[in-house]
Amino acid sequence: MVNITIDNHTIAVPSGTTIMEAAASIHIPIPKLCYLKDINEIGACRVCVVEIEGQDHLVTSCNNVVEEGMTIYTNSPKVRRNRKHTVEMILSQHDAQCATCVRSGNCTLQTVANDLNIVDSPYKKEICIEEWDTRYPLVRDASKCVKCMRCIQVCDKIQGMHIWDVSGTGARTTVGVSENRDIKTADCALCGQCITHCPTGALRERDDTDKLYRALEDKDTIVVAQIAPAVRAAWGESLGLSREEATVEKIVDALRRIGVDYVFDTTFSADLTIMEEGTEFVERFTNGDLDMYPMFTSCCPGWVRFIKSQYPQMVNRLSSAKSPQEMFGAVMKTAFAKKMNIDPDRIFALSIMPCVAKKDEREKPLFHGEFAGHGVDCVLTTRELDRLIRADHIDSKTLKDAAFDTPFTEGTGAGVIFGATGGVMEAALRSAYYLITGKNPEVDAFKQIRGVNKNGWTEAQFEIAGNTIDIAVVSGLQNTRNLMEAIQKREVHYHFVEVMACPGGCVGGGGQPIHEGKELASDRGSNLYFLDKTAHLRFSHENPDIKHLYDEYFGSPGSHKAHQLLHVQK
């Protein structure tokens, strides 16, 4: 242990503890702007400086470790003056039009400046302006960049994509797309992790709420919404609702108040995905197609973008099943329209998703032949949903639980856990077991695949009707790259692999609410598993609305019509 004094508090901390960590252990907060534990500890912002007795210069607390006998002052007059000057200089290069920024009220720079009682910026403004195609799902505003390097480090260390890099020198230093590439050709997976780790509004998703408003204003348009599983685990966080209060049924109420005509749960189409993907897996496994390389899940568009750009030779190993979002879009424009006697051209299909890449997925024409067109018309992230609710002046405390609309009311616990890493695989195995044996397994027979082991992915082996099935589950694109390399080198072999681009799965998606310095994917995922545990239906193949859909429209999983509408044509 190391004995130190911080702001007149004498404490002992383990060797190797940083000054910032030592201060936090006795509830002394030190302001910071660029720091992300274990990811970005470079002291670039110099907001976290402290004074050490006997030293002339101030030191950054995020990356300097304590030493025996140190006396540290976190808020001495010298520290206060320096810290305030540093933030004022940062503000001189920052477009501080906070009232029109999506991060207003949830901006680390804004919080630090307010806490330092900065009411004016005494320095000449030198704002960096760079062109960016704001039609792209990911938007970067250079005028709000504070050069913290978080986006670079997250993209490099966690996702392994190296999309961002430093450019320029000295006062002209900035962050941009690496190698001076255009973002549209830079192989970005659109995972959005750079957005959720940015301390300001320099990175954000394209806002599509106006597109929804235009549809709502058109009296001839019928707006049909779907809500993804992971959204229910996070939407209430920035609206002051506890997890117990923030039910998915209250989102239904909010959307109806806004003017949406029909609201459905994407867990329904997650169950539909399981029926199609599970059937495909059983067929490919039985035919020996998986003896050498696995079948990969295809519901995560960030992962699909990744495999297409990084491992194009493996694209044919993807399941042909569309994602739950796109399956529901297809069902809305066909089976739903037919059942409700609605002209499909009048339907505006809205998705509420935890994901930035879903905006890009929507733009891909995934219908074919007589069904050519787009299934989904607009995708809003969880953050956009929250902004939508506030823009309509809806007090979240007044929301009531409202039921989903018919004819697709039911969703199972298996569909709910799609939002957490391992959930798709677990749901698929529950139904694959039934498809192979004609019997249900123990409902939690496959729960060992939840979580991540030291290799960065989880692997397991199951026996089903005398068949040995090897599976793997991975989230985060650097982990995914490591797994793909191991598969290609034949170091490992699996029959079925689930991949999620975002760490922790959709619950940690790039469109989820942002909390400075906190990673909430695990907590949100636990919430989804609780909802599964308490659901009255936990097997996708037992969903009565899924059974009715097949009986009335598709015939059976894997049928010709199902392949036309629910699968990507390879």
List each model region and its residues.
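Eukaryote-biased recognition of intrinsically disordered, low-complexity regulatory segments
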Residues: 1-9
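A generic beta-sheet turn/junction motif
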Residues: 6, 168, 464-466
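Short glycine-rich or small-residue beta-strand-to-loop segments that form or flank ligand, phosphate
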Residues: 7, 138-141, 226, 499-500
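A short N-terminal beta-strand-loop micro-motif at the entrance of redox/enzyme domains
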Residues: 9-15
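Residue-level recognition of alpha-helix initiation/capping sites
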Residues: 14, 136, 146, 189, ...
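Iron-sulfur-associated redox domains of electron-transfer enzymes in respiratory
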Residues: 15-69, 75, 79, 206-570
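Fe-S ferredoxin-like electron-transfer domains
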Residues: 46-190, 196, 203-218, 222
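Mobile "lid/hinge" segments at catalytic clefts and subdomain interfaces of large enzymes
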Residues: 162, 195, 385-389
